């Protein structure tokens, strides 16, 4: 029986973090396409699923941080639009 801790270390070494959001989404699309073929062994499918979860979490984190940055940047620039104000101009 394999030790869990060494297995986790091996998977981390095999799957480095993605370079950026676009790289992560491209890899995720490849994983999904590979799994949809139905040609993967159960072990390979499970490994691919785990990597997919890692990539999804990475992408969600990037999107969340980006949304927060946009809200901060737009905080002073956003004004409520009123058609009456626009027509008066």
Curated annotation (Swiss-Prot):
- Please provide the record's keywords in A-Z order: Cytoplasm, Exonuclease, Hydrolase, Nuclease
Subcellular localization is given as:
Cytoplasm
For biological process, the GO terms are: DNA catabolic process
Keyword DNA repair attached? no
Per the record, the major location class is cytoplasm
Q: Per the record, GO CC terms?
A: cytosol; exodeoxyribonuclease VII complex
What is annotated about its quaternary structure and interactions?
A: Heterooligomer composed of large and small subunits.
Report the NCBIfam families cross-referenced here: PRK00977.1-5, xseB
Q: Which family does it belong to?
A: Belongs to the XseB family.
Purpose: Bidirectionally degrades single-stranded DNA into large acid-insoluble oligonucleotides, which are then degraded further into small acid-soluble oligonucleotides.
Record-given protein name? Exodeoxyribonuclease 7 small subunit
Query: What is this protein's gene name?
Result: xseB
């Amino acid at each position: 029986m394999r030790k869990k801790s060494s297995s986790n270390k091996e998977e981390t070494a095999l799957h480095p973090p993605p370079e950026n959001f676009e790289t992560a989404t491209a890899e995720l699309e490849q994983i999904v396409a590979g799994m949809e073929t139905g040609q993967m062994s159960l072990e390979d499918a499970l490994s691919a699923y785990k990597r997919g979860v890692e990539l999804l979490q990475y992408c969600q984190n990037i999107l969340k941080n980006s949304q927060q940055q946009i809200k901060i940047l737009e905080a002073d620039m956003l004004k409520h639009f009123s058609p009456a104000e626009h027509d008066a101009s």
